[in-house]
Amino acid sequence: FEDSELPAVKTVEDILRSYVNDYCQDLMEQRIAEAVDPQLDFAVRIIMDSDLSDLKYLYAYGEYVSANERGVAEFLNSLSQEQIDSMAETYTEGYRIGFINGRKDITRKKTVNIRYNLGFERMVRSAILKFRAMGLEPVIYRHATHVVNKRGNARIGFTGSVANPQYDYDHRQDQALFLDSDFVQRKLRSMQNAYENYKELAAVHGGPACIETFGEKPFVPETKAEAWTLSETQQKQQVEIDNESGQIVNRYIKGDERSFTIIAYPIPEIGEKFPEIFAEIVKINTLDYKLYERIQQTIIETLDTCQWVEVKGRGGNETDLIIHLHGLEEVKKQTNFENCVADVNIPVGEVFTSPVLAGTGGILHVKKVYLNGLQFRDLKLVFDCGQVIDYTCSNFETEEENRAYIEDNILFHHAKI
């Protein structure tokens, strides 16, 4: 092909647009099947059938395997089965208790979606057995790799390490190549049809049980002019897809019937004391939730006497918020707050509420935070009537880049949130 003329850029773009439109239904169908059908058990078979003492099993997934995945697997292999089972018990019991505390009937569910990073297979194997004892079969799928199904650079599902975070970030808006009003309708119609085809399986799906990780080196992306970016019109179209697809999911996997749990562990990249840190995290994850439930109830009973809560930062933190609480007619019988212990969010705990929007406002300042694998420095969100009206951070040299970074990765192009 040395003498062949290269196709024009527009020709290649048109071919890719046609491909995406032609195969949208097939891609959505496959993705939704993976999300609810336990018979699609590629990952389950690796977990349950492999010799986990031989780390070659990690390469059976087809994912990038780094020192983190190998290090976690080696460390878990050094633990006793009793220790592994204890970790799995904390994780699975958090899921079960989440249903109880949410007054939801777990016996109506038949599947649970397990999400994890490679290396945690010993724990996941034990968890699968415990979930099965509850009557739940595992549904485990790979993070989305096709642009039709991806959500920015988020990795939802089982995953290895990210070989090149900048590459993932650069390609987070590749849908800008083909996103238009016709595709919006095509994708939503494909999603609706796929869920209708799998509605029986979707109805008995219980929701996700997530094993997250922390300790990786900070990644601060660069803005590349060559990367695809959504136009203003496409941003609105993406918001429409996100909103409508969420409603479709909720019709078939009802929000008032499903639950979740999240637990997190360090990875070797955190430093030389990884084993010690991991052991301490295990202890934290198994704190006596009944004790903290009582402690947090004292906080709730105090806050329930208030109409307003003022939150101020210190030590250079500029947070200055005032939060308007709902009035309670009978303080002894009513409360504004949820006493959340080690169920859906492990470890304990948190006390949270949904405030009155009118009168709730101010500045939330976080010096450093990680969201979906991205670092935000000096993140500031300004609220008025409970909505974000202004925002900035210090990741980039220009204010335009900083605002765009927040719009893309926190606000997701909503005008207000």
Regions found by a protein language model. Name each.
Residues 391-417:
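Dual-mode signal for accessory low-complexity, basic/Gly-rich regions
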Residues 326-328, 367-369, 384, 393-396:
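Histidine- and/or cysteine-centered catalytic micro-motif in compact active-site loops
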Residues 1-358:
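Active-site bordering "gate/hinge" segments
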Residues 342-380:
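Conserved AWS/pre-SET-to-SET junction and N-terminal core of the SET lysine methyltransferase domain
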Residues 376-393:
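Active-site and channel-lining beta-strand-loop segments
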